């Protein structure tokens, strides 16, 4: 648990530094687009996840790998240099947290709020629209929703907005029931 907090803290600091630099250079939307593209690549590629997380690969290997991705995807020089710095400092494993924190900062700057939604099954367009409307009413800001499917939830939904987590998943309800039965 402490590792998650430490990693998240590191991710937030690096994200803030990148956001400040991108703001100075008026490149926040372009850098955000680069990072969203990289986030999708991380989600799609097991090899990339292994490269980032595995201690078997040195900082130089990680830097070269991220640089090759940045070149192929035609990332902005700001993004490419940042990825190189992250790898050189041995923080490549924190990249997913950096991306999430950067997205939150960019959303806040636009007056929106970033919401990470996890469901057991993909949301239909009507469900996504209803969820966006409910979040807009509850939060008072326009939500920028990122969806993820996790069959382990069994049913229901989890919504993470900033540091708040709204968990209405069947998995958490069953876990609560199991805990209550063990206590009785």
Curated annotation (Swiss-Prot):
Keyword Cell membrane recorded: yes
UniProt cross-references to Gene3D superfamilies, sorted A to Z: N-terminal domain of the delta subunit of the F1F0-ATP synthase (1.10.520.20)
Keyword Transcription: no
PANTHER family: ATP SYNTHASE DELTA CHAIN
The protein's role, per its UniProt record: F(1)F(0) ATP synthase produces ATP from ADP in the presence of a proton or sodium gradient. F-type ATPases consist of two structural domains, F(1) containing the extramembraneous catalytic core and F(0) containing the membrane proton channel, linked together by a central stalk and a peripheral stalk. During catalysis, ATP synthesis in the catalytic domain of F(1) is coupled via a rotary mechanism of the central stalk subunits to proton translocation.
Subunit structure as annotated in this protein's UniProt entry: F-type ATPases have 2 components, F(1) - the catalytic core - and F(0) - the membrane proton channel. F(1) has five subunits: alpha(3), beta(3), gamma(1), delta(1), epsilon(1). F(0) has three main subunits: a(1), b(2) and c(10-14). The alpha and beta chains form an alternating ring which encloses part of the gamma chain. F(1) is attached to F(0) by a central stalk formed by the gamma and epsilon chains, while a peripheral stalk is formed by the delta and b chains.
Name of the protein described by the UniProt record: ATP synthase subunit delta
Species the sequence originates in: Phenylobacterium zucineum (strain HLK1)
């Amino acid at each position: 648990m402490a590792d998650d907090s430490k990693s998240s803290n590191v991710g937030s600091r690096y994200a803030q530094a990148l956001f400040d630099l991108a703001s100075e250079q008026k490149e926040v939307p372009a850098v955000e687009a680069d990072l969203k593209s990289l986030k999708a690549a991380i989600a799609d590629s097991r090899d990339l996840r292994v490269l980032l997380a595995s201690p078997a690969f040195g900082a130089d290997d990680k830097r070269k790998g991220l640089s090759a991705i940045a070149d192929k995807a035609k990332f902005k020089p700001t993004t490419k240099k940042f990825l190189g710095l992250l790898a050189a400092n041995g923080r490549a494993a924190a990249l997913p947290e950096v991306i999430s924190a950067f997205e939150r900062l960019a959303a806040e700057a636009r007056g929106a709020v970033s919401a990470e939604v996890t469901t057991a099954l993909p949301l239909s367009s009507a469900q996504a629209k209803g969820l966006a409307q409910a979040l807009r009413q509850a939060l008072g800001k326009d939500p920028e929703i990122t969806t993820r499917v996790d069959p382990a939830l069994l049913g229901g939904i989890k919504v993470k907005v900033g540091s708040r987590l709204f968990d209405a998943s069947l998995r958490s309800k069953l876990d609560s029931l199991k805990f209550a039965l063990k206590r009785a």
